[in-house]
């Protein structure tokens, strides 16, 4: 029997999908990311979405101003695609190094997505330009047709929208974000080097029974929603396979406690404080610790064409207790796994 490792040293990871919000929420949640992760792909779905180079530069400056002293962190900005976005704005931002990627939200698919795209074929000229300049397209992969069951929206998106995009633009780099289904995992595994996917800790650790059986747990509610166990197991198998098409993207999405614990609660899991220990715990359960570094720190940079980080982080087998809540002015934010203990801690 192989002895369990007591320490894990990996290249410093990056988070390829995060919501940092703005103002007081930004300054509250950012340190949990900037302490551990070197870079993060920052989602553009603020209340006023990031659709211009100027707004991206201003948001990046607000993020950098909130990074605590001693943390080395680079926010990678994204452009929010809309029905009327000017292709010139997109290409200028990418060529100037302001935009790392562009984000496609189908209109009304998730938080602050009302400005999203309602007619995806109508923005094919943008995709053509992105393919030409090598700019990645990040996709929230759910259809928004009210007639489609919420648990089926990701699988339907593959057939109706994603496959036609890939057929039309075969060399467009696409990240299928926060995948939640066996359909998506199989689709990415069957793809090529132009298709990647991020996977969150909550979708690896939990399924819809954890959220709904014995009482509703609003702090596990996110979009895309947790699916049945068979889908969870497929995601776990995908990351344990060692395929370089899957990489770390927490989709950490904080909301104030009262906005989660309400009669119509918001979607989003604030997992940044526990993200790396949570991923390590999953990979250990899967006997796949040999693939943890690639998932966290190598596959993402390779897909984006960016250098891997030079420095390392160390995980130690020391119990790590998640706080019950984190102060947010006069309110609070409830973190993922609140009050629970993980086997791994990041060595400070």
Swiss-Prot record:
Pathway: Pyrimidine metabolism; UMP biosynthesis via de novo pathway; (S)-dihydroorotate from bicarbonate: step 3/3. One of its GO terms (biological process) is 'de novo' UMP biosynthetic process. GO terms for molecular function: dihydroorotase activity; zinc ion binding. Zn(2+) 2 binds at residues 103, 140, 178. Zn(2+) 1 binds at residues 17, 19, 103, 251. PROSITE patterns: DIHYDROOROTASE_2 (PS00483). It catalyses: (S)-dihydroorotate + H2O = N-carbamoyl-L-aspartate + H(+). It comes from the Bacteria. Pfam families: Amidohydro_1 (PF01979). Substrate binds at residues 19-21, 45, 140, 223, 255, 267. Belongs to the metallo-dependent hydrolases superfamily. DHOase family. Class II DHOase subfamily. Homodimer. This is Dihydroorotase. It comes from Yersinia pestis. The lineage of its organism: Bacteria, Pseudomonadati, Pseudomonadota, Gammaproteobacteria, Enterobacterales.
């Amino acid at each position: 029997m192989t002895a369990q490792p007591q320490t894990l040293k990996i290249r410093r990871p990056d988070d390829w999908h995060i919501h940092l919000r703005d103002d007081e929420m930004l300054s509250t949640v950012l340190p949990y990311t900037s302490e551990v992760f070197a870079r993060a792909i920052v989602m553009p779905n603020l209340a006023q979405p990031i659709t211009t180079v100027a707004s991206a530069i201003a948001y990046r400056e607000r993020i950098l101003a909130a990074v605590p002293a001693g943390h080395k962190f680079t926010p990678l900005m994204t452009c929010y695609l809309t029905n009327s976005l000017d292709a010139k704005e997109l290409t200028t931002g990418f060529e100037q190094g302001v935009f790392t990627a562009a984000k496609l939200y189908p209109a009304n698919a998730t938080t602050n997505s009302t400005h999203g795209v309602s007619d995806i074929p109508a923005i094919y000229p943008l995709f053509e330009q992105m393919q030409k300049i090598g700019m990645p397209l990040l996709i929230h992969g759910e259809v928004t047709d009210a007639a489609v069951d919420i648990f089926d929206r990701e699988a339907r998106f593959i057939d109706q929208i994603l496959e036609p995009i890939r057929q039309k633009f075969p060399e467009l780099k696409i990240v299928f974000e926060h995948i939640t289904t066996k359909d998506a995992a199989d689709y990415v595994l069957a793809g090529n080097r132009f298709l990647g996917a991020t996977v969150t800790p909550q979708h690896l650790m939990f399924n819809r029974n954890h959220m709904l059986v014995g009482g509703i747990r609003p702090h596990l509610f996110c979009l895309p929603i947790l699916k049945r166990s068979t889908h969870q197991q497929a995601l776990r198998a995908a990351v344990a396979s060692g395929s370089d098409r899957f990489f770390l993207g927490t989709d950490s999405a904080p909301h104030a406690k009262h906005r989660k614990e309400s009669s119509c609660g918001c979607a989003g899991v604030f997992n940044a404080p526990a993200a790396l220990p949570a991923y390590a715990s999953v990979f250990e359960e899967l006997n796949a610790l040999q693939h943890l570094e690639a998932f966290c720190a190598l596959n993402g940079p390779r897909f984006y064409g960016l250098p891997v980080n030079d420095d390392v982080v160390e995980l130690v087998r020391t119990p790590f207790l998640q706080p019950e809540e984190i102060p947010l002015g006069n309110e609070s934010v409830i973190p993922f796994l609140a009050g629970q203990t993980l086997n791994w801690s990041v060595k400070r």
